[in-house]
Amino acid sequence: MKTLVICSGGLDSVSLAHKVAAEHDLIGLISFDYGQRHRKELDFAARAATRLGVPHDLIDMRQIGAHLSGSALTDDVDVPDGHYAEDTMKITVVPNRNAIMLAIAFGIAAAKQADAVATAVHGGDHFIYPDCRPGFTQAFEAMQAQALDGYASVRLYTPFVHEPKSAIVTEGERHNTPFADTWSCYKGGEVHCGRCGTCVERREAFHLAGVADPTPYADPEFWRAAVEGR
């Protein structure tokens, strides 16, 4: 299955890229710059492509991202601390982000005669992000079947959509994903903050998977209180 992987440079998507490279025919990685404050993640995506020996396409969506206002990921709004399961994390939603990225990725995949677009949405995303839920991914794939009817047949590959993040860590370890060479933190500092939702979820996932976490955190113990306080 010739597959184009949407890769942010984070733990989930880099692990997915390594899984696809091992199990399918990885034809490239595609990343999106939508003006996110943690833009440094894109450097990790580029390194993953180099490591896996495939092209890396970086799509400039900054002009579009400027209009998707109100999110802590793109605007001058503080990224909240705590676990993803808290309502405060809804401020990190970028409206319709995945739908826009997937539409572009499907067009590129069709042009490249790929069989699939892969994205690393997972079960832990469902509470906060509606465009990571199975209902969305199924509907989007059905829509693309109509959009590309008679031109191309491209499926949406979402192997983690019903899985917790800890399962991604387990799968990533199985495929020798270099976890230290991934970036998750939404604050985009020198090291992972250890306090934002994605840092807490990352740290918890390694703990639940029983895999050593190689990530340096500015606050390495905050996650415990955040998880206990859910």
Curated annotation (Swiss-Prot):
GO terms for molecular function: ATP binding; ligase activity, forming carbon-nitrogen bonds; zinc ion binding. ATP binds at residues 7-17. Disulfide bonds: none annotated. It comes from the Bacteria. Pfam families: QueC. InterPro entries: QueC (IPR018317), Rossmann-like_a/b/a_fold (IPR014729). Keywords: ATP-binding, Ligase, Metal-binding, Nucleotide-binding, Queuosine biosynthesis, Zinc. Its EC number is 6.3.4.20. Zn(2+) binds at residues 185, 193, 196, 199. Pathway: Purine metabolism; 7-cyano-7-deazaguanine biosynthesis. Belongs to the QueC family. Catalyzes the ATP-dependent conversion of 7-carboxy-7-deazaguanine (CDG) to 7-cyano-7-deazaguanine (preQ(0)). This is 7-cyano-7-deazaguanine synthase. The lineage of its organism: Bacteria, Pseudomonadati, Pseudomonadota, Alphaproteobacteria, Rhodobacterales.
